Amino acid sequence: MESYYGFHYRRNLAFCQNSFGKEGFMFVFIRGAGDLATGISIRLHRAGISVCHSDLAIPTAVRRNVAFSEAIRLGECSVEGITAVRADTVEEIEAALAERKVPVIVDEGKEFLHKLKPDAVVDAILAKRNLGTAITDARAVIGIGPGFTAGVDCHAVVETKRGHDLGRVLLEGSAIPNTGIPGIIGGYGKERVLRAPADGILEKTLPIGTLVKAGDVCAVVNGIPMRTEIAGVLRGMLQEGITVFAGMKAGDVDPRGEAVEYRNVSDKARAIGGGVLEALLHFLPWELCENKRN
């Protein structure tokens, strides 16, 4: 597998090199570093594209074991053999890219985005609304999910709703509006989500990957148990010690149980990542991609 990706990576370098240490033919800045953003990043990284993420100082990704946002908390993490590292300066970003790693920075606005001047920007915050991304941020700006309108605040939108159009690239209009109900997996939707039972500190969390039964206690908040409604595998859980509010999404149970490979990115993340790669190919021909950060 390494030789396969290595072959394509060397071939792509022949077309274009950016100014980040000759480590890719395109430089993409991804806002957000949760599990779906990480799936996008892995797809682009394996295509030879240099990627940098931004996220919150205290990330709230539930599926932490497949989220590059863990690099902010731990300093370094790996997903499917790709290593992400925390970076706090432009120099540290460049050093990470030179080692074929994925830098992740703390930036709740667009300070680093403006400094780096990437070829493309992907907004994968998944806030269901636009938190400041503009179509003028880069030559190609891609919005993930609802909250964006292609041709207005971005060049393309990638559909995130499970179903026939998952991963579809929209060059005009918007993604399907948020329903507030998670996609159906194994016959369950909202029942899959674990929500904090009260305001307070998340404690006594079960490890991600634990098989649970309906009614099992998966964590505790202020002495109140957070129970799962269904049986399955615990695919996500916020880090112990984080402050939560009542009703906040704090965990995720997949009813497919042992059949789920919770240590790899999801089918949904891969589909969305494919859509992003398609959009980049549409807007930025390889031979014209040359990052000019100076």
Predicted regions and their residues:
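Short terminal hydrophobic/aromatic SLiMs and anchors at protein ends
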Residues: 4-5, 9
